Amino acid sequence: MSNKKRSASSSRWLQEHFSDKYVIQAQKKGLRSRAWFKLDEIQQSDKLFKQGMTVVDLGAAPGGWSQYAVTQIGSKGRVIACDLLPMDPIVGVDFLQGDFRDELVLKALLERVGDKKVQVVMCDMAPNMSGTPAVDIPKSMYLVELALDMCRDVLAPGGSFLVKVFQGDGFDEYLREIRSLFTKVKIRKPDASRARSREVYIVATGRKL
């Protein structure tokens, strides 16, 4: 891609981003990101969070989902968050900075979870996008497979899994895998998710024994 085309594409993205009503609302409300609104819509329909829950947030930065989750689980709840990028502190959130794909980071994350199972695992991870689906989709599927592995390790029976997935090769197989592990599975496209984006959110509840 030429610099001219890249510049035009970047300019369009910036214009779209800063005119987005959810970006504007997030700024007015002092929220970390527009992702807050996606999770709020999902919570209204699927009721994932309750007071006192422990939640794992993968791909947490800049903190939109963690920020929302703590409002739902209260002072007795706990969010354990992880991201490759730094994240400013949030009261009620135990944040670990590191690459989730790294064995040492995963070990540290599991140590923070401890022996008790968690009630929700949520994953908003995405790779650095090249704009080429044949490259981006496999990278994304690898990340969400790791997140599902995390569910197998730490999610309590009856627990819930929320994951952002980009539709493409491997999506149907991944969905079948999730359905084998949970009693109820829904696909959501929140209003705050841009229409042209391939992203959808799989909401899986009732982790099977």
Curated annotation (Swiss-Prot):
Q: Which InterPro entries match?
A: RNA_methyltr_RlmE, RNA_MeTrfase_FtsJ_dom, rRNA-MeTfrase_E, rRNA_MeTrfase_gammaproteobac, SAM-dependent_MTases_sf
Annotated GO biological process: RNA methylation
User: Which molecular function GO terms apply here?
Assistant: rRNA (uridine-2'-O-)-methyltransferase activity
Which reaction equation describes what this protein catalyses?
A: uridine(2552) in 23S rRNA + S-adenosyl-L-methionine = 2'-O-methyluridine(2552) in 23S rRNA + S-adenosyl-L-homocysteine + H(+)
The record lists S-adenosyl-L-methionine as bound by 63, 65, 83, 99, 124
A cellular component term (GO) from this record?
cytoplasm
The answer on whether this UniProt entry bears the keyword Ribosomal protein reads: no
Task: Give the Enzyme Commission number.
Answer: 2.1.1.166
Cell location: Cytoplasm
Keywords for the protein's UniProt record, in alphabetical order: Cytoplasm, Methyltransferase, rRNA processing, S-adenosyl-L-methionine, Transferase
Quote the catalytic residue positions. 164 (proton acceptor)
Q: Note the NCBIfam families from the entry.
A: PRK11188.1, rrmJ
Functional summary from the UniProt entry: Specifically methylates the uridine in position 2552 of 23S rRNA at the 2'-O position of the ribose in the fully assembled 50S ribosomal subunit.
Task: Please report which protein family the annotation says this sequence is part of.
Answer: Belongs to the class I-like SAM-binding methyltransferase superfamily. RNA methyltransferase RlmE family.
* Record-given protein name: Ribosomal RNA large subunit methyltransferase E
User: What is the phylogenetic placement of the source species in the record?
Assistant: Bacteria, Pseudomonadati, Pseudomonadota, Gammaproteobacteria, Enterobacterales
